[in-house]
Amino acid sequence: MKITFYGQNTLALKIGDIHVLVDPFITGNDLSKDKVDINDLKADYILLTHAHQDHILDAEAIAKNTGAVIVSNFEIANHYEEKGFEVHPMNHGGSWDFEFGKVKYVNAIHTSSFPDGSYGGQPGGFVIEGEHKNIYIAGDTALTMDMKLIPMHTKLDIAVLPIGDNFTMGINDAIIASDFIECDKIIGCHYDTFGYIEIDHEEAKKKFYEKGKDLMLLDIGESIEL
């Protein structure tokens, strides 16, 4: 499994020969828009955690370019199906075996509305089991006891957690979340994109290190392999 970070909560996963894109927000992100061309991105599937603009902005353009299947909650899937896109609707607690692996849609504590204010269903996260590697992508969320359910069904190799505070968990809660999910290898997301969520990188990594954990703050376009 190859994981590439494109800023905010945008990730590209390469699982075998399948390309999975998560929460594409590039053209509206000052940190990534001059570094990443959405026309170059490959996607067989686009996973959307919720409907906020900083998670869906480029989903339509990329789906048009690639023919990707959009996977999200029932309301978001319906929204895109009505626009003519191929979709796969899910909801909390449900799982599905896709060609790249098993995906479970799990709870997140946040809000979810489209940029026009219309209802975007309930936000969620994804647990993906693919190519003998397991990843939890939390999406935007507060710390929640529901996270303790994840290691009951999946042993994680890595997790992607929001750390920017104000709108989501901050560093301290993310450390607790990593305890809840029993995973010490964390990719940070949802930070530095705008003023409310700027963080001190060295302090954040130090706090994780002091708890025996590894916090990775990847550069735009940087990849890791599991």
UniProtKB/Swiss-Prot annotation:
This is UPF0173 metal-dependent hydrolase GFO_2312. Gene3D superfamilies: Ribonuclease Z/Hydroxyacylglutathione hydrolase-like. HAMAP family: UPF0173. Coiled coil: none annotated. The keyword Hydrolase applies. Belongs to the UPF0173 family. One of its GO terms (molecular function) is hydrolase activity. SUPFAM superfamilies: Metallo-hydrolase/oxidoreductase (SSF56281). Pfam families: Lactamase_B_2. Keywords: Hydrolase.
